Swiss-Prot record:
<feature type="binding site">
    <location>
        <position position="237"/>
    </location>
    <ligand>
        <name>ATP</name>
    </ligand>
</feature>
<feature type="binding site">
    <location>
        <position position="320"/>
    </location>
    <ligand>
        <name>L-glutamate</name>
    </ligand>
</feature>
<dbReference type="InterPro" id="IPR027303">
    <property type="entry name" value="Gln_synth_gly_rich_site"/>
</dbReference>
<dbReference type="GO" id="GO:0046872">
    <property type="term" value="F:metal ion binding"/>
</dbReference>
<dbReference type="GO" id="GO:0006542">
    <property type="term" value="P:glutamine biosynthetic process"/>
</dbReference>
<dbReference type="GO" id="GO:0005737">
    <property type="term" value="C:cytoplasm"/>
</dbReference>
<protein>
    <recommendedName>
        <fullName>Glutamine synthetase</fullName>
        <ecNumber>6.3.1.2</ecNumber>
    </recommendedName>
</protein>
<dbReference type="InterPro" id="IPR036651">
    <property type="entry name" value="Gln_synt_N_sf"/>
</dbReference>
<keyword id="KW-0460">Magnesium</keyword>
<feature type="binding site">
    <location>
        <position position="313"/>
    </location>
    <ligand>
        <name>ATP</name>
    </ligand>
</feature>
<keyword id="KW-0067">ATP-binding</keyword>
<dbReference type="Pfam" id="PF03951">
    <property type="entry name" value="Gln-synt_N"/>
</dbReference>
<feature type="binding site">
    <location>
        <position position="229"/>
    </location>
    <ligand>
        <name>L-glutamate</name>
    </ligand>
</feature>
<feature type="binding site">
    <location>
        <position position="289"/>
    </location>
    <ligand>
        <name>L-glutamate</name>
    </ligand>
</feature>
<dbReference type="GO" id="GO:0004356">
    <property type="term" value="F:glutamine synthetase activity"/>
</dbReference>
<feature type="binding site">
    <location>
        <position position="283"/>
    </location>
    <ligand>
        <name>L-glutamate</name>
    </ligand>
</feature>
<keyword id="KW-0547">Nucleotide-binding</keyword>
Length: 439
């Protein structure tokens, strides 16, 4: 968007603009400026202190600059404010640990190979009543695809969907999920950077609308023990010269198969990025439709990578382990880098399955070469430290990310020891609720 055009878009009611970026956890951060300073924010940028932003700079060298991306300008329909995403700079150069900048660089690498990535997410969330405690209360007892009286939140879902186009999101399917008070609103796929922005916007819209109704919306992977977890399946395709290169004559193309091979090869390390919280691994357990075993198959929802039954230009893969606690910019960069590694090195996919992996014997899984995803954040971080490709995907953010996450894991272990709880507990602790409920 031309800067002058963006300035002309102002509604007379818009007095302030929110400059939005995310921290290492994917949590939105930012500041507001008078609307009259938007052009300055685009051309020169607005300086800020990065030392208090998780995963950014130390206090001894904390000066950063936010430059607005005018193509992301939107006006919030329930408030007299606009929002804009952007990129972060340090010393007049792109800041190496900026999550949005990291994804941009990963996409530039993909484009050098001639590819453009499109991603469609399926973020799930729970709605809870506000009661001032961590005794979470559910406002409805609906189940999967319920549309009658059990689904008390259908009007809230509709309201969220009605606001989405104002932020550039196109809602496609709204429905109650498997868990009581659990919901999903799918929106149309887009280019990877736009989709990452859209995930941040979708969380913002959902939480704001829930707040209007006196409820909390949480994207925490596993807010309730014994209930289904919140996932964020990613539907991914690569395009070249306007054509979907995942499309083969009979099923997927060789490029798509190698892309799958790359993700399977790096799957263990990827979980540290796509499932980056202690709580993530309480969702990744058998029997809740969350993938645990590193495998792939056509139409098979027990596999880590599923190929949906759509061909032609709709050819794509579905990566099923990510959850909404992931920083979408990091997650997309890492997954695409892993897939590109598969294409470059012609990595054939392994562990193909047609049957339910959960019901297989351990011997059968071993025979098919099916391995298991890490069972905890600590295990995932160990795998990340050994994986050059995924580490490189995080760029200059890797050091901050790995240090931050190890401290997170150690803090959790200290909590368990203090509470005399086993290290492998699958119960959801108050430590997790306090840390992840508002992600």
């Amino acid at each position: 968007m031309n800067i002058s055009v963006s300035m002309n878009k102002f509604d007379s009611k818009i007095k302030f603009v929110q400059l939005v970026f995310v921290d290492i956890n994917g949590m939105p951060k930012g500041m507001e400026i008078p609307a009259s300073r938007l052009e300055e924010a685009v051309t020169d940028g607005i300086s800020f202190d990065g030392s208090s932003v998780p995963g950014f700079q130390g206090i001894e060298d904390s000066d950063l600059v936010f430059k607005a991306d005018p193509d992301t300008y939107v006006e919030v329909p329930w408030d007299n404010v606009a929002r804009v995403y952007g990129f972060i700079y340090k010393d007049n150069k792109p800041y190496g640990a900026d999550p949005r900048g990291i994804l941009k660089r990963a996409l530039e690498e993909l484009e050098k190979e001639g590819y453009k990535a499109y991603i469609g997410p399926e973020p799930e969330f729970y709605l809870f009543k506000k009661n001032g405690t961590w005794e979470l209360e559910i406002p409805d007892v609906g189940g999967y695809f319920d549309i009658l009286t059990l689904d008390k939140a259908r009007d809230i879902r509709r309201e969220i969907a009605e606001y989405m186009p104002s932020f550039g999101l196109i809602p496609e399917v709204l429905h109650h999920e498997v868990g009581k008070a659990q919901h999903e609103i799918d929106f149309r796929y887009d280019e990877a950077l736009k989709t990452a922005d859209n995930i941040v916007s979708f969380k913002y819209i959902t939480k704001a609308v829930a707040e209007m109704h006196g409820l909390y919306a949480t994207f925490m992977p596993k807010p309730l023990f014994g209930f289904p977890g919140n996932g964020m399946h990613l539907h991914i395709s690569l395009w070249k010269d306007g054509e979907n290169v995942f499309m083969g004559e009979e099923g997927l193309s060789e490029i798509a198969l190698h892309f799958i091979g790359g993700i399977l090869k790096h799957a263990k390390a990827l979980t540290a990025v796509t499932n980056p919280t202690v709580n993530s691994y309480k969702r990744l357990v058998p029997s809740y439709e969350a993938p645990v075993y590193i495998s792939w198959g056509y139409r098979n929802r027990s596999a880590l990578i599923r190929v949906p039954a759509f061909w032609g230009k709709g050819a794509r893969i579905e990566y099923r382990c990510p959850d909404p606690s992931a920083n979408p910019y990091f997650a997309f960069a890492a997954v695409l880098k892993a897939g590109l590694d598969g294409i470059k090195h012609k990595i054939d996919p392994f562990a193909y399955v047609e049957e339910n992996v959960y019901e297989m014997s351990e011997e059968k899984r071993k025979e098919l070469g099916i391995e298991t995803l890490p069972g905890s954040l600590g295990e995932a971080l160990e795998e990340l430290e050994k994986d050059k490709v995924v580490k490189e995907a995080l760029g200059d953010a890797y050091k901050n990310f790995i240090n931050y996450k190890w401290k997170e894991w150690e803090s959790y272990l200290e909590y368990l020891e203090e509470k005399h709880m086993p290290k492998d507990t699958k119960k959801v602790t108050e430590w997790e609720l306090e840390r992840y409920f508002f992600l």
